[in-house]
């Protein structure tokens, strides 16, 4: 079973008192964010939700006008759409992927925390409700300890205590007037489970050639699989792509793995929306031996740095035009935090065909082996639309098992 969760914090400050969403748009945004994160953290794990960021930016876009609005639309890749058309797409897509029963659970929630007595335009509130089903809560940000506790409690209640301490009292002060919280989490059972009795300790080789011992899951079954060339014409120039579906076949995890002797950093520059689409269209269902680490990761990302790097700058300065949100002048974005987690383990709702542990061997076999014992890239995506829900990479799996979450309570 895999669990993913995400929260984005957007706090705003005033100086006066102190169908289906186009998948190529989300894919382009996903790749841009990923490239920024890998450039700023060369040897770090990465995890984020392009969908959650798009929803948070959608709320900000609703409140923007003039050059601030134009800047957001350009950065998000919405210029080819009619003005405001993206809001309907975001609403329809979030409604489509949200599910609380059946084969998987995915929830998306938005809440706007507003300073007591602070005026927010009624039309903006109505549009927030219509497009993002957002709720509004009034608080006193000068009571920063109480506000932090209140928001964290809201987060915990929404995620069944999976995510805690998203914000701290230091995130708020007397001049903070608005905080936007966007929460997304996903829980899915593998269509074909990894049997726990087949999990064994195994070596994971990092890009610096050091090794760590990790729990390695195993199963043999039919999955979507393909081999692709990185264009180098070298012996290690072929890399593997494996797609593992969750129950119901609507959502899947796509794993991208270079040959063991080839660092992931060699493969990452190739990453483009068109290549992701090629992977999805080219993998074929066949019998595969899969060795996949059991891992958990929780990561907090400063969205402010990312958004600035991708061209969104005006919302962070006093000249920001957020007059569609409020008539109050000099309102700007002061803090944006993106927090996410993922757990991947053996659980699923169907029994696996494989029986007993098979020793790992790199000798010739009758069907492909995918041995994920070195750094890899992964995507969680909607198989119908191709839209990327979560994206990341695993460089250090040993750091991914210390989050302390009790995922069984979800």
UniProtKB/Swiss-Prot annotation:
Residues that bear Phosphoserine: 83
Keyword Phosphoprotein: yes
Keywords for the protein's UniProt record, in alphabetical order: Cytoplasmic vesicle, Glycoprotein, Phosphoprotein, Protease inhibitor, Proteoglycan, Secreted, Serine protease inhibitor, Signal
A GO biological-process term: positive regulation of neuron projection development
N-terminal signal peptide: 1-16
Tissues showing expression: Detected in adult pituitary and adrenal gland.
PANTHER family: NEUROSERPIN, SERINE PROTEASE INHIBITOR, SERPIN
Entry similarity comment: Belongs to the serpin family.
Function: Serine protease inhibitor that inhibits plasminogen activators and plasmin but not thrombin. May be involved in the formation or reorganization of synaptic connections as well as for synaptic plasticity in the adult nervous system. May protect neurons from cell damage by tissue-type plasminogen activator.
Protein name: Neuroserpin
Gene: Serpini1
């Amino acid at each position: 079973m895999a669990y993913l969760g995400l929260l984005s914090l957007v706090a705003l400050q005033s100086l006066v008192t102190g169908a289906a969403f186009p998948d190529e748009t989300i894919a382009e945004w996903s790749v841009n964010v990923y490239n920024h994160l890998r450039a700023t953290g060369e040897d770090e794990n990465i995890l984020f939700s392009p969908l959650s960021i798009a929803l948070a930016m959608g709320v900000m876009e609703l409140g923007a006008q003039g050059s601030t609005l134009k800047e957001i639309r350009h950065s998000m890749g919405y210029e080819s759409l009619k003005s405001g058309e993206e809001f309907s797409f975001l609403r329809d897509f979030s409604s489509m992927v949200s599910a609380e029963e059946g084969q998987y659970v995915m929830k998306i929630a938005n809440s706007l925390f507003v300073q007591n007595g602070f005026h927010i335009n009624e039309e903006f509130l109505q549009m927030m409700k219509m497009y993002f089903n957002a709720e509004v809560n009034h608080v006193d940000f000068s009571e920063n300890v109480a506000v932090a506790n209140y928001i964290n409690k809201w987060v915990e209640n929404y995620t069944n205590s999976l995510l805690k301490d998203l914000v701290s009292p230091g995130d708020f002060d007397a001049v903070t007037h608005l905080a936007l919280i966007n929460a997304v989490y996903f829980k899915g059972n593998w269509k074909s489970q990894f049997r726990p009795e087949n999990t064994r300790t195994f070596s994971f080789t990092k890009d610096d050639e050091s090794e760590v011992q990790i729990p390695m899951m195993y199963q043999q079954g039919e999955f979507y699989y393909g081999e692709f060339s990185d264009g180098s014409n070298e012996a290690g120039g072929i890399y593997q792509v494996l797609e593992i579906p969750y129950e119901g076949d609507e959502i899947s995890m796509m794993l991208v793995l270079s040959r063991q002797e080839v660092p992931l950093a060699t493969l990452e520059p190739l990453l483009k929306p068109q290549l992701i689409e090629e992977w999805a269209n080219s993998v074929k269902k066949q019998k595969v031996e899969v060795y996949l680490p059991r891992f958990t990761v929780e990561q907090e990302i400063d969205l402010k740095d990312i958004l600035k790097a991708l061209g969104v700058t005006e919302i962070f300065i006093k000249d920001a035009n957020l007059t569609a949100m409020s008539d109050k002048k000099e309102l700007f974005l002061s803090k944006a935090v993106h927090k996410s987690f993922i757990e991947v383990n053996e659980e699923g709702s169907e029994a696996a065909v494989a029986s007993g542990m098979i020793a790992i061997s790199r000798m010739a076999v009758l069907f492909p082996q995918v041995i994920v014992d070195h750094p890899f890239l992964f995507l969680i995506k909607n198989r119908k639309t191709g839209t990327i829900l979560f994206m990341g990479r695993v460089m250090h799996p040993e750091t991914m098992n210390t989050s302390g979450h009790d995922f069984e309570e979800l």
